[in-house]
Amino acid sequence: MEEDKQYKVLLIGDSDVGKTSIVKRFSDDTFDEDLLCTIGVEFKMKEVKVDGKKVDLCIWDTAGQEKFRALISSYYRGAHGIILTYDVTKRESFDNLNYWLNEVENFANRSNLVKLLVGNKIDKENREVTREEGAEFAKKKAMLFIECSAKSKIGIQQAFEELAQKIIEIPQNTSSSQPKQRNTGSVKVEDEPDHNQGVCSC
């Protein structure tokens, strides 16, 4: 029987765009209006089915605050997928997307990295970024694109399933399996990450 595969997915983007809410909605089907900002990196394990196959995603939720950005850079290594997130009600978070893509270019170490652009908070009425703008940006950068709402659940499951589908379509990603890790955890940014530890080490 073929072993299940585990793939590392990193959520990046400005602070307060809803990265943690997206992860919690996907992994636990919960939503909290009063979530605190992520300090450092937190991760969750979640299984999805793609074409009848079980795919284990190790989802890393990163801090978006500027003071943590340099410390987070090392966590790009080994990622199979990137979810670049912005808030459709905050133009600045969309304008900063190129900064985050530069971070990916500088620190990610896979040439076949799958990138998904996600516009979050479409449940709100005060939209500042149109769907067309998001789709056009993603097209120019060769990214997948979806809009979603962690609050109303719209697009959340689809986003991760589409990303997982693209990841496993890459032959190099399915040639060997990664050891399964525990289901949740966090990493302090004060410390240099130890990549020999059993923390979702895909």
From Swiss-Prot:
<dbReference type="InterPro" id="IPR050227">
    <property type="entry name" value="Rab"/>
</dbReference>
<dbReference type="GO" id="GO:0034389">
    <property type="term" value="P:lipid droplet organization"/>
</dbReference>
<feature type="binding site">
    <location>
        <position position="38"/>
    </location>
    <ligand>
        <name>GTP</name>
    </ligand>
</feature>
<dbReference type="GO" id="GO:0005811">
    <property type="term" value="C:lipid droplet"/>
</dbReference>
<keyword id="KW-0488">Methylation</keyword>
<dbReference type="GO" id="GO:0003924">
    <property type="term" value="F:GTPase activity"/>
</dbReference>
<feature type="short sequence motif" description="Effector region">
    <location>
        <begin position="35"/>
        <end position="43"/>
    </location>
</feature>
<keyword id="KW-0636">Prenylation</keyword>
<feature type="binding site">
    <location>
        <position position="64"/>
    </location>
    <ligand>
        <name>GTP</name>
    </ligand>
</feature>
<keyword id="KW-0547">Nucleotide-binding</keyword>
<keyword id="KW-0449">Lipoprotein</keyword>
<keyword id="KW-0342">GTP-binding</keyword>
<feature type="binding site">
    <location>
        <position position="32"/>
    </location>
    <ligand>
        <name>GTP</name>
    </ligand>
</feature>
<comment type="function">
    <text>The small GTPases Rab are key regulators of intracellular membrane trafficking, from the formation of transport vesicles to their fusion with membranes. Rabs cycle between an inactive GDP-bound form and an active GTP-bound form that is able to recruit to membranes different sets of downstream effectors directly responsible for vesicle formation, movement, tethering and fusion. Plays a role in apical endocytosis/recycling. May be implicated in transport between the plasma membrane and early endosomes.</text>
</comment>
<feature type="binding site">
    <location>
        <position position="15"/>
    </location>
    <ligand>
        <name>GTP</name>
    </ligand>
</feature>
<comment type="similarity">
    <text>Belongs to the small GTPase superfamily. Rab family.</text>
</comment>
<dbReference type="GO" id="GO:0012505">
    <property type="term" value="C:endomembrane system"/>
</dbReference>
<feature type="binding site">
    <location>
        <position position="19"/>
    </location>
    <ligand>
        <name>GTP</name>
    </ligand>
</feature>
<dbReference type="GO" id="GO:0006886">
    <property type="term" value="P:intracellular protein transport"/>
</dbReference>
<dbReference type="GO" id="GO:0140220">
    <property type="term" value="C:pathogen-containing vacuole"/>
</dbReference>
<dbReference type="Pfam" id="PF00071">
    <property type="entry name" value="Ras"/>
</dbReference>
<feature type="lipid moiety-binding region" description="S-geranylgeranyl cysteine">
    <location>
        <position position="200"/>
    </location>
</feature>
<feature type="binding site">
    <location>
        <position position="21"/>
    </location>
    <ligand>
        <name>GTP</name>
    </ligand>
</feature>
<dbReference type="GO" id="GO:0005525">
    <property type="term" value="F:GTP binding"/>
</dbReference>
<feature type="binding site">
    <location>
        <position position="123"/>
    </location>
    <ligand>
        <name>GTP</name>
    </ligand>
</feature>
<dbReference type="GO" id="GO:0005794">
    <property type="term" value="C:Golgi apparatus"/>
</dbReference>
<protein>
    <recommendedName>
        <fullName>Ras-related protein Rab-18</fullName>
        <ecNumber>3.6.5.2</ecNumber>
    </recommendedName>
</protein>
<keyword id="KW-0653">Protein transport</keyword>
<feature type="binding site">
    <location>
        <position position="18"/>
    </location>
    <ligand>
        <name>GTP</name>
    </ligand>
</feature>
<dbReference type="InterPro" id="IPR027417">
    <property type="entry name" value="P-loop_NTPase"/>
</dbReference>
<dbReference type="InterPro" id="IPR005225">
    <property type="entry name" value="Small_GTP-bd"/>
</dbReference>
<feature type="region of interest" description="Disordered">
    <location>
        <begin position="171"/>
        <end position="202"/>
    </location>
</feature>
<feature type="binding site">
    <location>
        <position position="121"/>
    </location>
    <ligand>
        <name>GTP</name>
    </ligand>
</feature>
<feature type="modified residue" description="Cysteine methyl ester">
    <location>
        <position position="202"/>
    </location>
</feature>
<feature type="lipid moiety-binding region" description="S-geranylgeranyl cysteine">
    <location>
        <position position="202"/>
    </location>
</feature>
<feature type="binding site">
    <location>
        <position position="150"/>
    </location>
    <ligand>
        <name>GTP</name>
    </ligand>
</feature>
<keyword id="KW-0378">Hydrolase</keyword>
<dbReference type="InterPro" id="IPR001806">
    <property type="entry name" value="Small_GTPase"/>
</dbReference>
<feature type="binding site">
    <location>
        <position position="20"/>
    </location>
    <ligand>
        <name>GTP</name>
    </ligand>
</feature>
<feature type="compositionally biased region" description="Polar residues">
    <location>
        <begin position="171"/>
        <end position="186"/>
    </location>
</feature>
<keyword id="KW-0813">Transport</keyword>
